[in-house]
From Swiss-Prot:
A GO molecular function held by the record: structural constituent of egg chorion
Superkingdom in the source lineage: Eukaryota
GO cellular component terms attached to this protein's record: egg chorion
Span of the signal peptide: 1-7
Organism lineage: Eukaryota, Metazoa, Ecdysozoa, Arthropoda, Hexapoda
One matching Pfam family: Chorion_1
Role according to the record: This protein is one of many from the eggshell of the gypsy moth.
UniProt keywords, alphabetically: Repeat, Signal
Family the UniProt entry places it in: Belongs to the chorion protein family.
Official protein name in the record: Chorion class B protein Ld32
Listed GO biological process terms: chorion-containing eggshell formation
Length: 173
């Protein structure tokens, strides 16, 4: 049995900007200066290593904790089972995530079947951004200039899951 999940950190917003709006991540680690996530080099963006594992609780058996940090966006995450998976998934931020459900096979002639998919309080949106070959957009893949177009050089090696730089997404210098 193998479990894995990949994710990509595009940076966190400075809590001083959005703190009064109630948009702070409830599971973020508060650093000495109140930043979300582990602090990079005096930057309000963390690398996400302090995020707690998300607990998927199946109806029988133990929990399926998943915790991940990666510089490469996932192409898919699949769970296949003949059982019912229930539980709560808490996610904060803008994630490259699309959920789909497929029902295959022979269904019982008696009983009921249901597929329920929701996104918490309904405050969600589909966001699509092109990673054009412009320095300010290329940094999400560990190359180019600083995050959010700050025009500061960064270091990146996506295959190694390492990202550093001033105001970047890494556990910077």
């Amino acid at each position: 049995f193998v479990q894995s999940a990949l994710s990509q950190c595009l940076g966190r917003v400075d809590r001083r900007i959005i703190g009064g709006c109630g948009l702070e991540a409830p599971f973020a680690w508060d650093g000495a200066l109140g930043w979300d996530g582990l602090r990079g080099w005096d930057a309000p963006y963390g690398c996400g290593l302090a995020a707690p594992a998300i607990d998927f609780s199946p109806t029988s058996g133990g929990a399926l904790p998943v915790s991940s940090a990666s510089a490469i966006a996932p192409v898919g995450l699949a769970v296949a089972s003949e059982n019912v998976y229930e539980g709560i998934l808490a996610a904060a931020g803008e994630l490259p995530f699309v959920g789909t459900v497929g029902v295959e096979g022979i269904l019982p002639t008696a009983g009921a079947g249901a597929v329920h998919h929701s996104c918490g309080n309904g405050l969600n949106e589909m966001a699509s951004r092109d990673a054009a070959f412009v320095p300010r957009f290329a940094d999400a893949y560990g190359i180019g200039l600083g995050a959010y177009g700050l025009e500061v050089p960064v270091l990146g090696a996506p295959a190694l899951g390492y990202r550093a730089g001033w105001k970047g997404c890494g556990c910077g210098l």
